[in-house]
Amino acid sequence: MSLSLWQQCLARLQDELPATEFSMWIRPLQAELSDNTLALYAPNRFVLDWVRDKYLNNINGLLNDFCGTDAPLLRFEVGSKPPQMAVLQPASQHASEAPSQAAVARPRPSRPSWDNAPVQPELSYRSNVNPKHNFDNFVEGKSNQLARAAARQVADNPGGAYNPLFLYGGTGLGKTHLLHAVGNGIMARKANAKVVYMHSERFVQDMVKALQNNAIEEFKRYYRSVDALLIDDIQFFANKERSQEEFFHTFNALLEGNQQIILTSDRYPKEINGVEDRLKSRFGWGLTVAIEPPELETRVAILMKKADENAIRLPGEVAFFIAKRLRSNVRELEGALNRVIANANFTGRAITIDFVREALRDLLALQEKLVTIDNIQKTVAEYYKIKVADLLSKRRSRSVARPRQMAMALSKELTNHSLPEIGDAFGGRDHTTVLHACRKIEQLREESHDIKEDFSNLIRTLSS
C-alpha cells in the first residue's frame, strides 16, 4: 500500500459528495500511511469531529473496497502530518514550520502570523460588529448548516481556513448574522484584532470621501491593514468601476497577507451583473456557500428561540401555524412574532392560533394571495421557458418532467394544499406522484448545484 490509496479515496469522495461538502471537509485533510494505519490530520478539532461524525463510514467503506481484508486502520489527529525525514531541511530554513493545506481553490502563500500581527496605533478602527449576533443565537438547520460551519471555522482560524468565504442567498436568511458572529468570534479569540464589518455602500462612500479629501493613500492603508474585512451585499459594487478597481487591489493585498475576507451577496458570484469578471473570479477562490430559505422545522425553532429570548411562552402549535404560513425568510418570521407579542402585551390576551390569525390577518391574507399553485405554475413555466400546459400534460421528457417536479415541490413548500390537491392541480395526478416529485427535488438539491440554484431563485421570486 502507498499514499496513493488516499488519493484513490479522494477521487471517489469527490465524485460522491457535493462539491461544497468535499471542499469544506475532505480537501483540508492530510494523510499519512504507516504500519497499516492511515492517519488523517484535520486543521482543527471542529473539522476532525465533523469528519469523524459524518464521513467515517464513507472512508472506511472505501478503504475496504480498495484493500479488502488488508484495509488499514483509520486514525484521526488534529494538526499537520509530520515532515518526512528524507525531505527535512536544515533548522535554519524552518522546514518543519510548513503550513497545513487549506481548503481553498487557490494556494495560499503562507500561514498568517495572526497572534503576532503588529498594531498600528496611528489608525483608529471601528469594527461595527454587533455584539448581539453570535453563533449561539444563530438557529441552525439544513438550509444553513454548511454556511454556519464554514463561518465557525473562519472564526476559529481566520486567514487560514477558507479565504475568501463567500455567502450568498436571499434577503433575511442570516448572512449578516453570520458575518457579525464571525467578527465576534475573532475578537473573542484576540481582543485587539482589527475586524471591520460594513455594507458595500460604506466602502464606496469612504473611497469617494478619500478622493475628495486627497486621502486615498490613507484609505488604502486603512483597509489593507485589517485582520478581517467583512463586507455585506457585495452586489452593490455593480457598475461602480472605480470602487471595483480599488476593491480589486485591496482584495489582492489582503489575500497576500493572509488577512481574512468574508463577502455576502443575494446571488451566486458569477450571476452578479455589472461586476468585473476578474473580481467574480476572485470571489470564488476560497469557499462559496449558499444559505437557503429555512425549512419548516428550522422556522419553528427560530420562532421558539425568539419567543424564549423575549420571555414569552409560545405554544408549539402556534409556532407551527405561523411557520407553515410565513416561509420566505427569517426576518419576516421575527417581524411577525414581534407583532404577535406586541398585540398580546397590549391586550393581555393569551397567544393562541385564533389570536395569531387576528393579529396577522393582513400578512397572512397577502401571503395566501401571492403564493398559489396557479402562480407557482406560471412562475416555473416562465423560468424554464415552457408553457403551463406542458406542466399539466402527460409529457415525460426531462425538459418538462423536471420543471413539473420542481413546481410540485414548490407547491408543497409554499402552500397549505394537501398532496392530493396538488396532484389534482397538475392534470389530475395521484398524490404518490407529487410525493415522488418532492423527494426527487430534495435529492437533486443535494446533488446538483443547478437544481439547488433553481429552487432558491424560484423561492425568492415567489416570496418577494
From Swiss-Prot:
Chain intervals for the UniProt region annotation (Domain IV, binds dsDNA): 345-464
Binding site for ATP: 172, 174-176
PROSITE patterns tied to this protein: DNAA
Gene Ontology terms, MF aspect: ATP binding; ATP hydrolysis activity; DNA replication origin binding; lipid binding
Keyword DNA damage appears in the UniProt entry: no
Region described as Domain III, AAA+ region: spans on this chain: 128-344
Subunit structure: Oligomerizes as a right-handed, spiral filament on DNA at oriC.
Family: Belongs to the DnaA family.
Domain comment, as recorded: Domain I is involved in oligomerization and binding regulators, domain II is flexibile and of varying length in different bacteria, domain III forms the AAA+ region, while domain IV binds dsDNA.
Name of this chain's protein: Chromosomal replication initiator protein DnaA
Organism, as annotated: Sodalis glossinidius (strain morsitans)
Gene: dnaA
